[in-house]
Amino acid sequence: MSKLTTGSFSIEDLESVQITINNIVGAAKEAAEEKAKELEKAGPTLFPGLESYRDDWNFKLLDRYEPVITPMCDQCCYCTYGPCDLSGNKRGACGIDMLGHNGREFFLRVITGTACHAAHGRHLLDHLIETFGEDLPLNLGQSNVLTPNITISTGLSPKNLGEIKPAMEFVEEQLTQLLATVHAGQESAEIDYDSKALFSGSLDHVGMEISDVVQVAAYDFPKADPEAPLIEIGMGTIDKSKPFLCVIGHNVGGVTYMMDYMEEHDLTDKMEIAGLCCTAIDLSRYKEADRRPPYAKVIGSMSKELKVIRSGMPDVIVVDEQCVRGDIVPEAQKLKIPVIASNAKIMYGLPNRTDANVDDVVEELKSGAIPGCVMLDYDKLGELCIRLTMEMGPIRDAEGITAIPTDEEFADWVAKCADCGACMIACPEELDIPEAMGFAKEGDFSYLEELHDQCIGCRRCEQVCKKEIPILNIIEKVAQKQIAEEKGWMRAGRGQVSDAEIRAEGLNLVMGTTPGIIAIIGCPNYAEGTKDVYYIAEEFLKRNFIVVTTGCGAMDIGMFKDEDGKTLYERFPGGFECGGLVNIGSCVSNAHITGAAEKVAAIFAQRTLEGNLAEISDYILNRVGACGLAWGAFSQKASSIGTGCNILGIPAVLGPHSSKYRRALIAKTYEEDKWKVYDARNGQEMPIPPAPEFLLTTAETWQEAIPMMAKACIRPSDNSMGRSIKLTHWMELHKKYLGKDPEDWWKFVRNEADLPLAKREALLKELESKHGWEIDWKKKKIISGPKIKFDVSAQPTNLKRLCKEA
């Protein structure tokens, strides 16, 4: 890539000089803003700023869904005035209180995640424009609405790479403004930090959308393809007889050069290339638009990074960016695995060999003279990684290098355990390692083996062990058979939901006859192991919900099989339809999940997308039954993704660790004034049921999460058939997993047709006896009782300005 340098030149003595100015920084955005102003139909918030959504939408959400703060500690250590004790409603030296400080802490996580995705998008956009040119069309499948998140924010509907640049500049500009508010002596009100966090969440989905649409277009990924190929997944899929290149991270740009080199030199069947985290998902999408037989494999999520390294299987490791462990170099160095850093965001202190000759770098790394290197030239990267893997494979195979102990070493380590319990205290998942070690001493290794799936591979246990027992290696030793059999299938990320699919399902979603969209996303910080998300997905799929998934969740769902040996991806269709399991793609593909909800409003309801976030979000909150699940959320990106869903009116359930994010958004269902909206036909207030009753909350167990999510798909606009279907699922799931009927089911009944058909008579009796409702038993109709009346033509909205009288 050419580098810009400063300098000057004179044209005084030159004749017939023509100067061409190719690009002025910021000019694209300015031109786009002027173009957006000319739109015939547009909402009030084209190119919004920090304040744009505050009063019209964000504060309305935050009034109903009040922030519940969960501080990690009572101190603020932000500046040299501190540390300040903020307990007991005290204020710090700068004047900030605990609410404001906690709001800032949550907000900081959100903008960090937003920046991560935006920087990912900027890197890909610049690289792909340099490689393919600005005119490369955004071919994303059979759709006209290509970039709903970009359109909502800017009014723009880009059709090629170059037209995306103004949206990218917009996100970057607003991120700078947002980051400035974190400085000491800036914002101090918790409610305004929450509003800014919601705005940042909306920007995050723009950044993610940019990241994914440019790579789908340039790298020939599947394009809204429900039949995208099935990809092998799991540690057991790796052929140990072949040299193995392991790639880790989220930015697939450099990996495509490695795959190209493999194909050009006929090496696809002579070595293995597989990945961890979202780079794995995206390398399995590369050139799969025509459904060619895939050869790249997926190992799994971040929780498997250290396990894979300790196994000794990789011959070379390449890292790019995001969710990459900080100890990969020292861990790999112990096992003679060279590490190559391919992105400037992670360089690990390694020597930079970007300008070096590839032959020389191969020799340096092969000899062990350096543990790894930085290589930012993608052409060289592709050659270096493949050649090095092919040479390191035989060398490491001959030495049989692995961190897994021998039987004798295993017995010695187990015998050393003093049963002090320090490992269990240090474990984020509180795994009972001492108990498992105790049984292992007696020859029963099943308890240790059970820990394999539950362990997130963080090695905190090892660092506190007084006996210096390599506990992770011990667990992996007894799980060798389990690891060898870890072979599943994951459908390659298919890309966005097509316009045709939205047209087919839009009415069902708004009326409620499709019970809802369940979005399983996020990280692998599971409290009880990866199978939780499999159980959740299976339950909702069997009940005809649409289950969409991305990232770690998409991978972990594919790890398990039923009694017939089939994964969920083999059992259920890949289309956006009732009972469909839709792997959208990697983390950045999450933008297509919110995009699908936005497209329901735009395509089915003909609402204007351009600069119209509040109206679109209002429509989704009142009409589109959807709920997200980030069961293992750990990262800042997870908080920004979830917050971007929240501003759109989409609730999200997080796992038990997620109280550490410091903030939830939970409504008080007993405050009836909070559960009123306007009828857009006449501007009159109308009561609605308390649904969804949260925008962001946590659950302790997957059994608790399932009925919570089913309930969160209830919407005010459900027709009677839809409400009956949703109540049936919610009540059955509540009974199945929590052992009793929900206490507040009656609040969602508007007339007898809303009741679950199979239990209608019994529920009518309960309404009469427990709640005093009047029932006509001859006609089996409700005469009086419900506070909410059903009106199929009602137009619920939270925005007074959308009412006809306004």
Curated annotation (Swiss-Prot):
[4Fe-4S] cluster 4 binds at residues 427, 455, 458, 461. CO binds at residue 117. Its EC number is 1.2.7.4. Its cofactor is [4Fe-4S] cluster; [Ni-4Fe-4S] cluster. Keywords: 4Fe-4S, Iron, Iron-sulfur, Metal-binding, Methanogenesis, Nickel, Oxidoreductase, Repeat. It is an enzyme of class 1 (oxidoreductase). PROSITE patterns: 4FE4S_FER_1, 4FE4S_FER_2. [4Fe-4S] cluster 2 binds at residues 76, 79, 84, 94. Pathway: One-carbon metabolism; methanogenesis from acetate. [Ni-4Fe-4S] cluster binds at residues 250, 278, 323, 523, 552, 587. It catalyses: CO + 2 oxidized [2Fe-2S]-[ferredoxin] + H2O = 2 reduced [2Fe-2S]-[ferredoxin] + CO2 + 2 H(+). [4Fe-4S] cluster 1 binds at residues 73, 77. [4Fe-4S] cluster 3 binds at residues 417, 420, 423, 465. GO terms for biological process: acetyl-CoA metabolic process; methanogenesis, from acetate; nitric oxide catabolic process; response to hydrogen peroxide. It comes from the Archaea. Binds 7 [4Fe-4S] clusters per heterotetramer. Binds 2 [Ni-4Fe-4S] clusters per heterotetramer. Residues 407-436, 446-475 form the 4Fe-4S ferredoxin-type domain. Heterotetramer of two alpha and two epsilon subunits. The ACDS complex is made up of alpha, epsilon, beta, gamma and delta subunits with a probable stoichiometry of (alpha(2)epsilon(2))(4)-beta(8)-(gamma(1)delta(1))(8). Cluster B is an all-cysteinyl-liganded 4Fe-4S cluster; cluster C is a mixed Ni-Fe-S cluster which is the active site of CO oxidation. Cluster D is also an all-cysteinyl-liganded 4Fe-4S cluster that bridges the two subunits of the CODH dimer. Contains two additional 4Fe-4S clusters, dubbed E and F, that probably transport electrons from ferredoxin to the B cluster. Belongs to the Ni-containing carbon monoxide dehydrogenase family. Part of the ACDS complex that catalyzes the reversible cleavage of acetyl-CoA, allowing growth on acetate as sole source of carbon and energy. The alpha-epsilon subcomponent functions as a carbon monoxide dehydrogenase. This is Acetyl-CoA decarbonylase/synthase complex subunit alpha 1. It comes from Methanosarcina acetivorans (strain ATCC 35395 / DSM 2834 / JCM 12185 / C2A). The lineage of its organism: Archaea, Methanobacteriati, Methanobacteriota, Stenosarchaea group, Methanomicrobia.
